[in-house]
């Protein structure tokens, strides 16, 4: 035990009895299975309220059992394996996507050390000297399942969805890792429990505001959620990488997506919102950060981030692919590099005995955060219409005479196609159409005496 008996000593990990370790793992598994069910229901309800609808209201009291009914329906559906797929990889891909999402939660601290049946143990399955890097690596493995699902489906749309997901993860994990680096530099550790202990008095959301904004943006892109859901864009790729999946395989992809949402939300809580520390003014109460109360504060913070996911999906349209890539490579990564250099400089001055850390970081953070907001607004503001491009005349087109242009048959393929540069349409003869008597259907009688 360290720091007045509240924060767990790293030596405590690995010495729990087997039944206690099994109980912790089972509790985390139940938490990660139940939270997506509640998140899906809350998402449908909140989006319905934002769109002035009712939402699920049939299954159970006020529709509270709708997620359970959907899960049972998916489990009872027939699993259809399309013809021409790579069957072993096709079956394993959902498992590869779902398992790392569960593994990443092993190092997330739910609370301080407590007594369970006489054994003093931290409310955390385990901890590592590089725990945050472990989470980053585990969440990165999930994209292999998405890519393999797209490749093994034997279809164009799933393959394009898998390739998009790969580019998305590569682009945004760089910015995410740089936001982690700022936290490591200030906390002096990569251990999740150590980072929580470093935020006992001041949360990093205030000291490292640019890192927080960059991480929140990156975590939405990392989980393929709207407005960054390009790998499964319905209007472009039908269903994306899981177009050819049904039944439990499709359910595992959905479970992996929502478990990843919970994981990145828990990591944001751990790194920037003080972890399981009580928010102000509840922190003024002496017992707020001891016992089982911190589990409640941690869960409420995670649900706050989950609400942000739902809010973004209900309010923002999907970005174009070029906008999305430009946001990652032209805005987030350069600003992350500059911010990490600022944090490293402040840390170096602190090591030399200059204790102006809080003031310097807050001032620099506000400036960088303002720059981030302005750049995001300029790039993503509504009504931004790109300037029309002027048509470029092919080289030599103006000098070509009609005699030198290549003859072109627009009906060669059975349907009309436009000519390419350097080709000309043949002259068509117009068939004259006679309109004489077009409205006459028979002889007319004029001045008839009958």
From Swiss-Prot:
Top-level EC class: translocase
Bias (Basic and acidic residues) ranges: 390-400
Residues annotated as transmembrane: 18-38, 91-111, 128-148, 169-189, 201-221, 262-282, 292-312, 324-344, 358-378
GO terms, biological process: aerobic respiration
InterPro entries: NADH_UbQ_OxRdtase_su1/FPO, NADH_UbQ_OxRdtase_su1_CS
Catalysed reaction equations from the record: a quinone + NADH + 5 H(+)(in) = a quinol + NAD(+) + 4 H(+)(out)
Protein's UniProt keywords contain Iron-sulfur: no
Protein family membership: Belongs to the complex I subunit 1 family.
Subunit structure: NDH-1 is composed of 14 different subunits. Subunits NuoA, H, J, K, L, M, N constitute the membrane sector of the complex.
HAMAP family hit by this protein: NDH1_NuoH
Role played: NDH-1 shuttles electrons from NADH, via FMN and iron-sulfur (Fe-S) centers, to quinones in the respiratory chain. The immediate electron acceptor for the enzyme in this species is believed to be ubiquinone. Couples the redox reaction to proton translocation (for every two electrons transferred, four hydrogen ions are translocated across the cytoplasmic membrane), and thus conserves the redox energy in a proton gradient. This subunit may bind ubiquinone.
Name of the featured protein: NADH-quinone oxidoreductase subunit H
Annotated organism of origin: Rhodococcus jostii (strain RHA1)
Protein encoded by which gene: nuoH
């Amino acid at each position: 035990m360290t720091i007045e008996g509240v924060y767990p000593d790293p030596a405590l990990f690995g010495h729990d009895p087997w039944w206690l370790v099994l109980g912790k793992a089972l509790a985390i598994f139940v938490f990660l299975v139940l939270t997506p069910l509640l998140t899906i229901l809350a998402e449908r309800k909140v989006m319905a309220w934002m769109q002035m609808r009712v939402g699920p209201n049939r299954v159970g009291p006020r529709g509270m059992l709708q997620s359970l009914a959907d899960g049972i329906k998916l489990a009872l559906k027939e699993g259809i394996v399309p013809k021409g797929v790579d069957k072993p990889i096709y079956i394993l891909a959902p498992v590869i996507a779902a398992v790392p999402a569960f593994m990443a939660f092993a190092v997330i601290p739910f609370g301080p050390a407590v007594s369970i049946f006489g054994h003093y143990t931290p409310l955390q399955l385990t901890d590592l000297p590089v725990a945050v890097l472990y989470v980053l690596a585990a969440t990165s493995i999930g994209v292999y399942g998405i890519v393999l699902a797209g490749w093994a489906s034997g279809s164009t749309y799933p393959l394009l969805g898998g390739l998009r997901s790969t580019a998305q993860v590569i682009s945004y994990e760089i910015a995410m890792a740089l936001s982690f680096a700022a936290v490591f530099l200030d906390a002096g550790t990569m251990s999740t429990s150590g980072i929580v202990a470093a935020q006992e008095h001041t949360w990093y959301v205030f000291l490292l505001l640019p890192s927080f904004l960059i991480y929140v943006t990156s975590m939405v892109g990392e989980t393929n959620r709207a407005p960054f859901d390009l790998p499964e864009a319905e209007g472009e790729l039908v269903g994306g990488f899981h177009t050819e999946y049904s039944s439990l395989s499709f359910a595992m992809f959905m479970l992996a997506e929502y478990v990843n949402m919970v994981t990145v939300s828990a990591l944001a809580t751990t790194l920037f919102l003080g972890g399981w520390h009580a928010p102000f003014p509840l922190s003024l109460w002496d017992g707020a950060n001891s016992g089982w109360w911190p589990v409640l504060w941690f869960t409420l913070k995670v649900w706050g981030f989950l609400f942000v996911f739902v809010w973004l999906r209900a309010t923002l349209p999907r970005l174009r692919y070029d906008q999305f890539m430009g946001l990652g490579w032209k805005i987030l990564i350069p600003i992350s590099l500059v911010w990490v250099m600022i944090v490293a400089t402040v840390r170096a001055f602190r090591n030399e005995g200059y204790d102006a850390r809080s003031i310097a970081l807050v001032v620099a953070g506000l400036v960088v955060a303002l720059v981030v907001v302005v750049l995001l607004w300029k790039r993503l503001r509504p009504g931004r219409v790109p300037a029309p491009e002027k048509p470029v005349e092919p080289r030599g087109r103006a000098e070509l005479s009609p005699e030198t242009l290549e003859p072109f048959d627009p009906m060669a393929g059975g349907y009309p196609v436009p000519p390419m540069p350097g080709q000309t349409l043949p002259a068509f003869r117009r068939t004259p159409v006679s309109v004489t008597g077009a409205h006459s259907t028979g002889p007319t009688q004029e001045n008839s005496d009958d």
